C-alpha cells in the first residue's frame, strides 16, 4: 500500500468531518489543517531512481490518494490536472480516491476521462442516511469504472440497499470514529449494511470499531490499538462464496427468553394458528408438519444468500408459514436479529435443526 498526498489540508463540509483526524493531528503540532498546501510528494508516482526507473511499482500495491485532504477539494483545482497527468502516465498503478465531494466529480475530471479509467477506483463516503441519499444517486450516474462506498465514521443506521442493487458498487466498508471526542458506532448499524451487501452479493469490510462501540445495548470505550483488531476478530467482513461468516462466534438465545421477547412484539403476535390450521396439523400428523418445516429451511433459508430472502412466501397458507413469522424464522435477517445466527453463511445441520425445533414449539 502506498499513500500519495499531493496536497495537504481540507475544509469541513459535513457531519463526518466534525472530528477529522487530519485536523486533530495538525492541531497537535501547531498546524492549521484548513490551510491547503501543495506537498513535496506531489510527483511521488512518477519519481525515478538513478537508473531512470520508477521508484513505485505495481508490486507496491494500491496508491491511496489524498488521504490528508480531498481530491476534489475546490482549493486544489489548480493542481488536480497535474495529478490526472500522473495517473494517466502510470497506468500500471491502481489509484484509490476517497471523497466527500462526489458532487464536484464531473467538473474535475480530464477531457479524455470517457467512461472512466481502469486504474482508478472512486470511493464515496456516506456517514449517515442523509449523506447517503444525497451522494449515492449522484455517484451512480457518473462515468466511473470502479466504485466503492465507505461509511466511516458511521454515525447512524444507514439503508443503502436500493443503491447496492444497481450492481455498480464493487465494495462497501464501515467503521466507527476514533479520537477523544468520537461519536458512538452501534454494531446493529454495521450488521444492517452487511446484510444488505450480502443480499446484493457485494463484498463488505468492517474496518474498525471506533473508540466508542455499542454492542447488544452495552457501550464499550476502546483503546486505539484495538479498533482494527476487534473489528477483524468479529468476523463480520464478508466475501461472497468464501465462507467468511463461519468465523463469527455467536450464542443461540435461551429459549424461554426468546419466546418472552417474541410475545412483546406486536408484529409477531399477529400470527396465530387458526382452527383450520390446527385441523390440518391433526390430519397430517406432527411428523409430516416437521418434515415440511425441515424442507422449507433446507430449500429456502440454508443457503449463504437465499434467493429473494425476506420476500418469498413459498408456504403461504401453511401452518409452518404462520410459525415462521411468529417465531422470527422467516428470513436470514430475522434469524440474525432474533436468533443471533449470522447472515452470509450456509446453515449447518445443527442450525437447521434448531430452527425446526423453534418452529414446532
For the regions a protein language model found, what residue spans apply to each?
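Auxiliary Fe-S-binding modules of radical SAM enzymes
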Residues: 1-8, 161-246
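Short, compact, well-ordered microdomains
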Residues: 83-87, 91-96, 104, 206, ...
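Conserved, mostly hydrophobic/aromatic
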Residues: 17, 65, 97, 139, ...
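Histidine/lysine/aspartate-rich catalytic loop segments that bind and position anionic ligands
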Residues: 124-132, 137-165, 169-170, 176
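Conserved Radical SAM active-site core
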Residues: 1-120, 129-132, 158-169
Amino acid at each position: 500500500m502506498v499513500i500519495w498526498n499531493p496536497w495537504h489540508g481540507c475544509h469541513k463540509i459535513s457531519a463526518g468531518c466534525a472530528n477529522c483526524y487530519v485536523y486533530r493531528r495538525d492541531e497537535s503540532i501547531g498546524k492549521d489543517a484548513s490551510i491547503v498546501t501543495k506537498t513535496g510528494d506531489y510527483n511521488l508516482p512518477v519519481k525515478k531512481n538513478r537508473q531512470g526507473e520508477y521508484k513505485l511499482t505495481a508490486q507496491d500495491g494500491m496508491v491511496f490518494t489524498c488521504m490528508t485532504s480531498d481530491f476534489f477539494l475546490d482549493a486544489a483545482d489548480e493542481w488536480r490536472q497535474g495529478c490526472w497527468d500522473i495517473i494517466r502516465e502510470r497506468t500500471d498503478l491502481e489509484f484509490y480516491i476517497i471523497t466527500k465531494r462526489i458532487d464536484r466529480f464531473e467538473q474535475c475530471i480530464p477531457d479524455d476521462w470517457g467512461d472512466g479509467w481502469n486504474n482508478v477506483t472512486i470511493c464515496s463516503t456516506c456517514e449517515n442516511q442523509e449523506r447517503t441519499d444525497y451522494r449515492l444517486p449522484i455517484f451512480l450516474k457518473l462515468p466511473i469504472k470502479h466504485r466503492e462506498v465507505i461509511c466511516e465514521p458511521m454515525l447512524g443506521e444507514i439503508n443503502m440497499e436500493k443503491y447496492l442493487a444497481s450492481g455498480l458498487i464493487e465494495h462497501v466498508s464501515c467503521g466507527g470514529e476514533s479520537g477523544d471526542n468520537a461519536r458512538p458506532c452501534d454494531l446493529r448499524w454495521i450488521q444492517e449494511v452487511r446484510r444488505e451487501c450480502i443480499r446484493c452479493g457485494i463484498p463488505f469490510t468492517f474496518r474498525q470499531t471506533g473508540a466508542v462501540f455499542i454492542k447488544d445495548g452495552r457501550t464499550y470505550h476502546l483503546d486505539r490499538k484495538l479498533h482494527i483488531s476487534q473489528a477483524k476478530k468479529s468476523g463480520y467482513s464478508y466475501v461472497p462464496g468464501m465462507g467468511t461468516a463461519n468465523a463469527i462466534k455467536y450464542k443461540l438465545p435461551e429459549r424461554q427468553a426468546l419466546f418472552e421477547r417474541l410475545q412483546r412484539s406486536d408484529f409477531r403476535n399477529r400470527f396465530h394458528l387458526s382452527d383450520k390450521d390446527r385441523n390440518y396439523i391433526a390430519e397430517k400428523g406432527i411428523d409430516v408438519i416437521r418434515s415440511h418445516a425441515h424442507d422449507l429451511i433446507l430449500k429456502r433459508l440454508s443457503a449463504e444468500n437465499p434467493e429473494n430472502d425476506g420476500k418469498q412466501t413459498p408456504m403461504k397458507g401453511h401452518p409452518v408459514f404462520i410459525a415462521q413469522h411468529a417465531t422470527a424464522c422467516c428470513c436470514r435477517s430475522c434469524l440474525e436479529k432474533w436468533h443471533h445466527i449470522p447472515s452470509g453463511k450456509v446453515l449447518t445441520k445443527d442450525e437447521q435443526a434448531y430452527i425446526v425445533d423453534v418452529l414446532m414449539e
